[in-house]
């Protein structure tokens, strides 16, 4: 993939995470076939291409579709939160990238969590809980916060909160 294509896939990964955050916050459900590659991407430290981070382009398909719809302005009013999450995640990433100490802590903790995530299938909740703790201990301490909109019933569910924090990381 060209450099531009790599950037598109990376942005699609952000769009995919944002889309799943929106779905979990509003319905309490998620597409496992896209949640798994999104979460697994956190454990890919040394890959040759961005697509490999998602286990291939198929792992970022939902994000590619959402990114295409965003750019073509084919999304309705209900997708406004997804667009906001994308911009907020990118803004938070810039703040995170400026903090080398936090980067080191997050990487170290993700490397430790990846050992526990080797048998990811069937353990989504445990892995997301572990990653959620990393998010709470690091990025949630930054001044900028991402406000997630949705149903109180789904947002107050600790399992959903863990999935949302893991995706935001």
Question: Residue locations for each model-derived region?
Answer:
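A mid-sequence, solvent-exposed acidic-amphipathic segment
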Residues: 122-161
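Helix-start/N-cap signature of alpha-helical segments
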Residues: 3-10, 78, 82, 164
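Charged, amphipathic alpha-helical oligomerization/scaffolding segments
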Residues: 9, 13-20, 84, 88, ...
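Long amphipathic alpha-helical segments with strong coiled-coil/leucine-zipper propensity
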Residues: 42-123
